[in-house]
């Protein structure tokens, strides 16, 4: 089954939404700080979308060597244009998170590999985590934050999710897109199994998966692992 990239008007809509809500990235940035992000490191952002995270991170850590990768050529174009508008010289490239093809020069080189709100779209979830672990250097870390399937929400969580969608300043098309994102998202056990499968190929010294709604308003799954030192 082939994953479909976000293109055209949908890509533009995601960029408009992301560029107007930088505060929604605060929790993820805090998680990255906890994972040890620091100036001078190499960081790869898989499924980077239109590059909002890159703008935020390089504003806080100006010496990062940051590479954004996305399957959508439209998203890559938008990200490059957006970075130029913000006066940033950033690298964005076309690539599939489910394969390191096109990222061979980065294999085993990154201090940190991240992805935010994207792995729910993957058709081969273990392959996504495999790519993350292969890109990160021994001793480096990966961090993924993703949507949960609705079946993992308890009743209060589901009510919060419904209220969250209704309160977003989105048009009907975007509300449907986000609702479907959760409906088709993997279950919590799927994330656990996928990370464990990837770790069988590239050993890790630490891994943790947890769920909370901190900083976002709706429960999301956080997946962290540290590649075993050589």
UniProtKB/Swiss-Prot annotation:
Keyword rRNA-binding: no
One Pfam family it belongs to: Methyltransf_25
EC number: 2.1.1.-
UniProt record, GO biological process: antibiotic biosynthetic process; methylation
Pathway terms, separated by semicolons: Antibiotic biosynthesis
Gene3D superfamilies: Vaccinia Virus protein VP39 (3.40.50.150)
EC category: transferase
Keywords: Antibiotic biosynthesis, Methyltransferase, S-adenosyl-L-methionine, Transferase
CDD domains tied to this protein: AdoMet_MTases
Function: Mediates C-methylation at the 8-position of the aminocoumarin moieties in coumermycin A1 in the biosynthetic pathway of coumermycin antibiotic. Active on both mono- and bis-amides for mono- and di-C-methylation adjacent to the phenolic hydroxyl before it is glycosylated by CouM.
Similarity annotation: Belongs to the methyltransferase superfamily.
Name this protein carries in UniProt: C-methyltransferase CouO
Organism, as annotated: Streptomyces rishiriensis
Name of the coding gene: couO
């Amino acid at each position: 089954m082939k994953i479909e990239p976000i293109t055209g008007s949908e890509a533009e809509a995601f960029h408009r939404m992301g560029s107007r809500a930088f505060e929604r990235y605060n929790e993820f940035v805090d998680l990255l700080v906890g994972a040890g992000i620091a100036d001078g490191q190499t960081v790869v952002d898989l499924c980077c979308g239109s590059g909002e995270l890159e703008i935020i991170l390089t504003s806080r850590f100006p010496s990062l060597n940051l590479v954004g990768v996305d399957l959508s050529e439209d998203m890559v174009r938008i990200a490059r244009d957006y970075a130029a508008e913000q006066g940033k010289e950033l690298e964005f490239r076309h690539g599939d998170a489910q394969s390191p093809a096109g990222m061979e020069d980065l294999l085993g080189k990154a201090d940190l590999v991240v992805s935010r709100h994207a792995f729910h779209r993957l058709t081969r979830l273990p392959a996504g985590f495999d790519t993350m672990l292969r890109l990160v250097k021994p001793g480096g870390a990966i961090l993924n934050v993703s949507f949960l399937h609705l079946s993992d929400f308890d009743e209060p969580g589901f009510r919060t999710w419904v209220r969250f969608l209704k309160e977003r300043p989105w048009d009907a098309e975007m509300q449907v897109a986000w609702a479907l994102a959760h409906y088709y998202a993997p279950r919590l056990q799927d994330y656990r199994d996928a990370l464990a499968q990837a770790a069988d190929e590239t050993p890790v010294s630490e891994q943790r998966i947890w769920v909370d709604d901190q900083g976002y308003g709706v429960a999301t799954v956080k997946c962290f692992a540290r590649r075993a030192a050589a």
